[in-house]
């Protein structure tokens, strides 16, 4: 699958995870509704599904990975920033096939696209500190 299809999968995952975080609906229902309502022809749907289920299943673990590097409480994070960080941390912790720098750069781009004005700087700061602890030898 092309890198652009993976990028689109991440973009869709941010949107679906945002919905899941706010609604607390079952992730399978969120996935079904998202795929039924959105144009996903240029999306790596398998990767989208993996990101959704992986982040939802591991959300407490992923939150634990980010907490030491946050400048504020986890509960004070914006939902977009939380979704972006969870995706990046999932890729760093569970997807060795995703290069270290790709996971970070994609997260920064997602934060620029979907987050508040300076959220990409916040995401970059957290990941710059967390990533070496997650993948110490894989820069």
From Swiss-Prot:
Gene this protein is translated from: nusB
Keywords (alphabetical) are: RNA-binding, Transcription, Transcription antitermination, Transcription regulation
User: Is this entry keyworded DNA-binding?
Assistant: no
What protein family is recorded?
Answer: Belongs to the NusB family.
What does the record give as the function of this protein?
Involved in transcription antitermination. Required for transcription of ribosomal RNA (rRNA) genes. Binds specifically to the boxA antiterminator sequence of the ribosomal RNA (rrn) operons.
Q: GO cellular component annotations, sorted alphabetically?
A: cytosol
Gene3D superfamilies from the xrefs?
NusB-like
- Gene Ontology terms for molecular function: RNA binding
Read off the Pfam families from this record: NusB (PF01029)
One BP term from GO:
transcription antitermination
Q: Please report the name of this protein according to its UniProt entry.
A: Transcription antitermination protein NusB
At the top level, the lineage of the source is Bacteria
């Amino acid at each position: 699958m092309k890198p652009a299809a993976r990028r689109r999968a991440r973009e869709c995952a941010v949107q679906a995870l945002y919905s899941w975080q706010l609604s607390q609906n079952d992730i399978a229902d969120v996935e079904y509704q998202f795929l039924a309502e959105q144009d996903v022809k240029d999306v790596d749907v398998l990767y989208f599904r993996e990101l959704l289920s992986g982040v939802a299943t591991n959300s407490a673990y992923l939150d634990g990975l980010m907490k030491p590097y946050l400048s504020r409480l986890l509960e004070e994070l914006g939902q977009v920033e939380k979704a972006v960080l969870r995706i990046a941390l999932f890729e760093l912790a569970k997807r060795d096939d995703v290069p270290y720098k790709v996971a970070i750069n994609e997260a920064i781009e997602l934060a620029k696209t979907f987050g508040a004005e300076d959220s990409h700087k916040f995401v970059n700061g957290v990941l710059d500190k967390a990533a070496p602890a997650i993948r110490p030898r894989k820069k």
